[in-house]
């Protein structure tokens, strides 16, 4: 692992947007996974999320935006999940990249519908992290 940790944030809602803003305010370059190609294009062109916290502006050169969850996992040391619990399993099913040696944080509230578990327990039981 290199000296400066590389962060990846997963989720393009208001919570994910706020987390990305905090990380970029600290001077970090941040990988940001969002499902919406149109939101990604808008952020690149206009410097803000069109759907959530639209008054929050980003220095686009600090962002590595992608609709490919695996691309952001592979480019990051620290993974911060901010995907709503109702959609979490659907997004995690797209994962093929290794999570080995990754630092993983959940910023997700609620219960995962597929398992009935809180997110931390779901991660541990299904993915062993």
Model-derived regions: residue spans:
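NAD(P)+-binding Rossmann beta1-loop-alpha1 motif at the extreme N-terminus of oxidoreductases
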Residues: 1-52, 56, 63-67, 73
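Charged/polar, solvent-exposed surface patches and flexible loops
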Residues: 41-45, 71-74, 90, 121, ...
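A conserved beta-strand/loop capping segment in the N-terminal third of enzymes
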Residues: 53-94
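Rossmann-like NAD(P)(H) cofactor-binding subdomain of soluble oxidoreductases
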Residues: 78-129
């Amino acid at each position: 692992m290199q000296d400066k940790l590389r962060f990846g944030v997963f989720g393009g809602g208001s919570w994910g947007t706020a987390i990305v803003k905090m990380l970029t305010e600290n001077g970090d370059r941040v990988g940001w996974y969002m499902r919406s190609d149109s939101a990604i294009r808008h952020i690149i062109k206009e410097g803000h999320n069109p759907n959530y916290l639209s008054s929050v502006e980003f220095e686009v050169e600090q962002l590595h935006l992608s609709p490919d969850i695996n691309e952001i996992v592979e480019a990051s040391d620290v993974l911060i999940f901010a995907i709503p619990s109702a959609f979490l399993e659907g997004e995690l099913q797209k994962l093929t990249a290794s999570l080995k040696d990754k630092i993983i944080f959940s910023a997700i509230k609620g219960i995962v519908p597929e398992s009935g578990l809180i997110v931390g327990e779901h991660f541990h039981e299904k993915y062993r992290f």
